[in-house]
Amino acid sequence: TYMSSRGIIYEGKYRQLVKSKVSDEREHSILSIESKYLVEDKITGLPRWLLYSSLDQDLTEKLTLNIAYNRISDRNYFKDIDRSSPIDLSLKSNLILSYNDPKKNFSASILTEHEQTVSSVPNYQRAIDTSASKIFRSDKESPITLDLTTTKFTHKKSEKASGIRSTGTIGITRTFATEFPVITTKANYDIANYQLKEANDITRKSAGAGISFSFPFNFTSNLQGSYVKNNITPSLSYNYKQKVVQGSIPIFDTTDKYEDIITFADLTSGERYTGRDRVSNAND
């Protein structure tokens, strides 16, 4: 592409099959690169470039590597070269190494990410994030789930809180063997520790429990000469969380989804927040 005011822009796209899928349930491992390069901007005298790249590769049947690197030479690239004005845009890059063993009900991952702010407000970055999840007694009536995460949060603005958040959650569920209604109970205990850079450490502990009743109805109807099976399941649920004081805990990656609850599953989940910096309090 030739711009009379800027110069010649070289563009290229590359896509390669790195490795065939290791199983029918997985996808092929693909390397993808898109780039634009202006050797020397006639106005600024500087090189201007854009690079989008990604690699999704199954190292083994259980181990997967995902890499994304997206970056531009400077914040004015889109306005000057692409002739566009993106709103609230940031370019995200990350590296994720994940392990999943369905037979043992175990999964783990490690992640690091970077964000180049273009026209948005800088957000917290996960400099390093590790997590592990395990289901015990998965073949029993009362499976137990254990989730552990540790995340180091950083921010470009020095006045923003930063530090390491470590969380652990253990939960148990039980579905009683009744055909009607279907009764499911659950209980969980959560602990979170914050090691903050310029503030005292904070530890939060909370426990909760819930019960739900489902009333499944099955019936058959005739639609234009074809029989259709229908299933309607009214549900009634109650969730309780103990009251905890958490106003002093910084918000790294958590939002209140109260006004955005649009599904029945969200409404009955008993969880008001995304992320781990806030837990639902009693009567939230």
Predicted features, each with a name:
Residues T1-D284:
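Outer-membrane beta-barrel proteins and related beta-barrel translocases across Gram-negative bacteria
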